[in-house]
């Protein structure tokens, strides 16, 4: 949520603050320089004195029911043990890379060159060395995932001769595009050989065809915060998904804040950050990160502040949708589906939908149309300076195209619309247009502080009438690979719109810790009924089932 934490106390304090505020959080990332100076670049050891007891740090994060992810790079400083081993087998490249300065302070001192060199991930022996140190220095502590930065890799001042560099598989010119595949794959394959008890999680800045098999989520890089950048993230994510790699996200709020003076007090940036957060809630991964200002929601005020409340609202909404998101993720794994879907993937028959690049489907049922322009900030002159201030006096609207061939429900109001038309939706700061396809069966999970806090034994099941529909609820042990051996369960929900019946089929499969009984709280969505993320006071039907088929009538 900020560029990096300077100590383990600072990192742990953030997780504790979220728990105190009652705002959900599942993971925190430690970025670079926990290894100390740049001559020890990527040492895969906690040489920075601010991280005085890394085992305790990891244990404390886990004790707060959160996961910890850490930055690792594809290059090594000359004082690291890895550098010396890799140099012996000619598995280091000679071209310029990041960082160029030996000093970790900013701005860089180029008269003190770092000597950092990129390793050769095409070489299986180099990949073995890489994992050996990563395993002993960090994974053994119980680390939960990897932020693989600079996975292109960074290549500064490129010269034609750089591409003649010999790799294990030939010239760098020949294989450079596959660099991220090889380095990400090396970590993924080694971790999987090490254990099947912890699912692989890798966040990587770059990707290549086939990388989806390595448990990798790619982010869009260190983008500069602006409204144009936010708009561009939508089409970037959709094109990435169309390439066959389903897990993608961006630095919520933008990484660099060069365009904003005093950003946390700048109304324009605060609005941008909120809108980016709203978009991020409907990306395959929801993650905030950047330099120039810390990004935790409490940096934007406190409860009752419009920005704080909007951010909290969408974090909670993301968690409420976890049963839907987890089932969608299962479809990615089992049916080669995707999470963030360009309209052409579901509405190829609708010519008007083909050229739309600012809205998308999140899974098969939810249409998302992010707000990507400023609406609630204005310029005032104070003490001779022009400053941006908030102005919520007029609620603005946004046009939304609803693809034809389906009816659609406004997620926030329950109002029903015909497809094949453009509608105007009011978008106060805490609302982006969300529409749910008729025929959808949408499970809504419990309010939680972390993903696995509560079992899904008391789900709200929203029925969006107007078409037949199906949804398969998927559950497993959450953090191992036993599902590959069949340790999971599915329950199919089917809505027959003509007969007005909901069928909950026999549960299939089982796994350790599976619940035996579930309460399904059914609501038939209508105007101001079964809407938004608000608690439902009265359900239309309540069904208790023990895994056996149940048929429920509308009346």
Where are these regions (language model features)?
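Catalytic-domain carbohydrate-binding cleft regions of carbohydrate-active enzymes
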Residues: 1-431, 436-437
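Solvent-exposed beta-strand/loop surfaces of large extracellular or lumenal domains
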Residues: 409-429, 530-555
């Amino acid at each position: 949520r900020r560029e990096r934490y300077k100590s383990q106390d600072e990192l742990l304090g953030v997780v504790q603050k979220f728990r105190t505020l009652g705002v959900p959080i599942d993971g925190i990332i430690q970025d670079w320089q926990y290894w100390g100076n740049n001559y020890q670049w990527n040492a895969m050891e906690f040489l920075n004195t601010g991280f005085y007891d890394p085992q305790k740090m990891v244990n404390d994060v886990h004790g707060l029911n959160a996961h910890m992810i850490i930055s690792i790079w594809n290059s090594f400083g000359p004082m690291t043990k890895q550098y010396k081993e890799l140099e012996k087998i000619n598995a280091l490249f000679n071209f310029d890379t990041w960082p160029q300065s030996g000093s970790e302070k900013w701005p860089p001192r180029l008269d003190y060159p770092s000597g950092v060199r990129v390793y050769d991930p095409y070489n299986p022996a180099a990949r073995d060395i890489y994992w050996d140190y990563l395993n002993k220095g960090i994974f053994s502590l119980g680390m939960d995932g990897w932020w693989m930065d600079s996975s292109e890799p960074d290549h500064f001042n490129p010269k034609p001769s750089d591409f003649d560099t010999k790799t294990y598989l030939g010239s760098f010119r020949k294989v450079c595009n596959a660099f991220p595949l090889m380095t990400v794959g090396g970590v993924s394959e080694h971790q999987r050989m090490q254990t099947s008890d912890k699912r692989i999680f890798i966040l990587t800045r770059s990707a290549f065809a086939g990388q989806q098999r390595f448990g990798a989520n790619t982010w869009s890089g260190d983008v500069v915060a602006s409204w144009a950048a936010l708009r561009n993230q939508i089409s970037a994510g959709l094109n990435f998904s169309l390439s066959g790699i389903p897990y993608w996200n961006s630095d919520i709020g933008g990484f660099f804040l060069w365009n904003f003076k005093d950003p946390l007090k700048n109304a324009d940036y605060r609005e941008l950050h909120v809108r980016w957060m709203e978009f991020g809630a409907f990306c395959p991964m929801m993650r905030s990160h950047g330099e120039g200002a810390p990004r935790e929601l409490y940096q934007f005020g406190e409860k009752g502040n419009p920005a704080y409340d909007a951010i909290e609202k969408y974090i909670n909404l993301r968690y409420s949708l976890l049963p839907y998101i987890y089932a969608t993720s299962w479809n990615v794994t089992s049916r080669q589906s995707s999470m963030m879907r360009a309209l052409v993937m579901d509405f190829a028959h609708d010519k008007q939908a083909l050229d739309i690049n600012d809205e998308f489907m999140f899974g098969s049922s939810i249409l998302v149309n992010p707000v990507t322009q400023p609406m609630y900030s204005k310029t005032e002159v104070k003490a001779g300076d022009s400053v941006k201030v908030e102005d919520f006096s007029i609620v603005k609207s946004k046009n939304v195209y609803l693809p034809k061939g389906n009816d659609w429900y406004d997620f926030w109001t329950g109002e029903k619309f015909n497809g094949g038309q453009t509608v105007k939706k009011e978008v106060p700061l805490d609302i982006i247009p969300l529409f749910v396809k008729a025929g959808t069966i949408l499970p809504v999970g419990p309010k939680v502080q972390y993903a696995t806090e509560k079992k899904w034994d008391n789900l709200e099941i929203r029925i969006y009438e107007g078409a037949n529909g199906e949804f398969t609820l998927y559950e497993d042990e959450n953090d191992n690979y036993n599902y590959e051996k069949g340790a999971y369960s599915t329950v199919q929900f089917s809505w027959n719109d003509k007969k007005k019946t909901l069928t909950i089929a026999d549960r299939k499969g089982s796994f350790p810790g599976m619940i035996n009984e579930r309460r399904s709280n059914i609501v038939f969505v209508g105007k101001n009924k079964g809407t938004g993320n608000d608690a439902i006071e009265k359900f239309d039907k309540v069904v208790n089932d023990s895994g056996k088929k149940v048929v429920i009538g509308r009346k």
